[in-house]
Amino acid sequence: MSGMYGALTVGALGVSNNIGGLTTSWHSGMLDGASALISQNRGAGKYRRTLQLFLWLMAVDVMIGVLGLVLVSAGLPWLAAVFAQSKNHYDPAFCEMIVSIHRWEMLGYITLGINSATLALLLGYGYTKLTLLLNVARVFLFRVPVLWFFQRFTEMGMEAVGITMMVSNICAGVSAIAVVIPVLVRIRKKIRQEETCGKTLDK
């Protein structure tokens, strides 16, 4: 759909995604390792530890998002210039496009961290359908319809692509919070049951 704004916009969006990957790839790496740890502890009945792992992961992912936002905000013009430079040619228009798109997209770094931590917990507890729902919603509910709206009902230019990415990434984090709250309530119930059983056995 971004092709509506021209081939150069598609290229700029690809570069913007690559720049975003400097931060979000850390989230992905944490997700893979943490989901396995959460699953192992859940299998051992150590529900309190799974909750602790999730909270630590959430804190780390949010810090990564904040750090990424600060660093990329400071270095975005330079990063864009690197990607806009070929062997014998520098394209200032392409560089400006990259900056225009990513200055919006990067505002979702923190909420993507929240989304990543939530997915780790859901995968660790075997909530694969909820995980799929969040991933599908991010693209087909929060991204495609938003870009379609901008293209049909506004005069916004290629900057709409960056705003769409921002909306999609922020909504992904908000929806993850909405999904994870009832899951956390269930885990807390299991912890209380575990502690009650332990006290009964001690008696």
List where the protein language model places each region.
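Small-residue-rich hydrophobic transmembrane alpha-helices
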Residues: A12-L76, L112-T131
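Hydrophobic/aromatic end-of-helix segments at the C-terminal termini of transmembrane alpha-helices
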Residues: M1-G6, A34, G75-L79
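Interfacial/gating helices of multi-pass transporter permease domains
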Residues: S2-G21, Y90-V99, Y127, V161-I163
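Alpha-helical transmembrane segments of multipass membrane proteins
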Residues: M1, L22, A117-L121, V144-F149
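Hydrophobic alpha-helical transmembrane segments of integral membrane proteins
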Residues: V139, R143-G157
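Short alpha-helical transmembrane segments in multi-pass integral membrane proteins
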Residues: I38-G108, Q151-K203
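Short runs within selected transmembrane alpha-helices of multi-pass transporters and secretion channels
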Residues: H27-D32, E105-G124, L130-V139, V146, ...
